[in-house]
Amino acid sequence: MITLFLILCYFILIFNIIVPAISEKMRRERAAYVNYKRLNKNFICVDDRLFSYNFTTSGIKAKVAVNKNVPIPCSKINEVNNKDVDTLYCDKDRDDIPGFARSCYRAYSDLFFTT
């Protein structure tokens, strides 16, 4: 009987640890999606580079605005918004653009971890 009680306590303890973690993850993902929808395909400034996001089947992907494989600086955000510009997705590392991976990580963290 004591064994059954200990097993029951174990499952209650695990349940109380896992469920809040899952709900916190879902809350954070929902907040990121709301931030994504609020951007409405406009660019944001991250590390003096213009980033935007696309919602794909594998989730939200960050992309950087480029002109001839050179990231467009934040000072040109008014010229770039709502226009067709070339973009590079952050799913692959680019050695020809210095600091590309760091800026991509920051773009994701700005979307998911804003407070």
UniProtKB/Swiss-Prot annotation:
Organism, scientific name: Monkeypox virus
Report the protein name in the record: Virion membrane protein OPG147
What's this chain's function?
A: Envelope protein part of the entry-fusion complex responsible for the virus membrane fusion with host cell membrane during virus entry. Also plays a role in cell-cell fusion (syncytium formation).
Q: Which GO terms describe its biological process?
A: membrane fusion involved in viral entry into host cell; symbiont entry into host cell
**Gene Ontology cellular component annotations, sorted alphabetically:** membrane; viral envelope; virion membrane
Lineage here is: Viruses, Varidnaviria, Bamfordvirae, Nucleocytoviricota, Pokkesviricetes
Task: Supply the alphabetized keyword list.
Answer: Disulfide bond, Fusion of virus membrane with host membrane, Membrane, Phosphoprotein, Signal-anchor, Transmembrane, Transmembrane helix, Viral envelope protein, Viral penetration into host cytoplasm, Virion, Virus entry into host cell
Principal place of residence: virion
Q: How does it sit in the membrane?
A: Single-pass type III membrane protein
- Membrane spanning stretches: 1-21
Which family does the similarity line name? Belongs to the orthopoxvirus OPG147 family.
